[in-house]
From Swiss-Prot:
SUPFAM superfamilies per record: FKBP-like, GreA transcript cleavage protein, N-terminal domain
Function statement: Necessary for efficient RNA polymerase transcription elongation past template-encoded arresting sites. The arresting sites in DNA have the property of trapping a certain fraction of elongating RNA polymerases that pass through, resulting in locked ternary complexes. Cleavage of the nascent transcript by cleavage factors such as GreA or GreB allows the resumption of elongation from the new 3'terminus. GreA releases sequences of 2 to 3 nucleotides.
Family: Belongs to the GreA/GreB family.
Species this protein is from: Yersinia pestis
Keywords linked to the UniProt accession: DNA-binding, Transcription, Transcription regulation
Pfam family, one: GreA_GreB
Name assigned to this protein: Transcription elongation factor GreA
Lineage: Bacteria, Pseudomonadati, Pseudomonadota, Gammaproteobacteria, Enterobacterales
Gene Ontology molecular function terms on file: DNA binding; RNA polymerase binding
Amino acid sequence: MKQIPMTVRGADKLREELDYLKGVRRPKIISDIADAREHGDLKENAEYHAAREQQGFCEGRIQEIEAKLSNAQVIDITKMPNNGRVIFGATVRVLNLNTEEEQNYRIVGDDEADFKQNLISVNSPIARGLIGKEVDDVVVIHTPGGEVEYEILSVEYV
């Protein structure tokens, strides 16, 4: 399988979720199934069927997280050489030359991306346009909303 780039923080969040699902959620669902079984006829037992459905969702998510972690290429940005170039995991401050607004973006893996928190996927048009560039470079990025011109103001490796 293809390796998935992921920050240390992203891998830690997935491990936390996996621990919660295995240590808290799964045992609770098993208990709910056992309680529902005690109510008799399983054919018309809505509690039983709901708990079994939750069990399916939980087990599916556990498998999904385990697969992602087994294929993850965890990249610790703090151990990367600081050469001033935009790379995976870097935090980039840019100036949108169309609107004169400054914006900070952190380039992360697909599963970590959250545009509202300025975490952009390494596969997003903005990240693809910025990767490999340096401070003071001006880049034109083709986004779904049209072309945007950015000047790179700073690159941090935190």
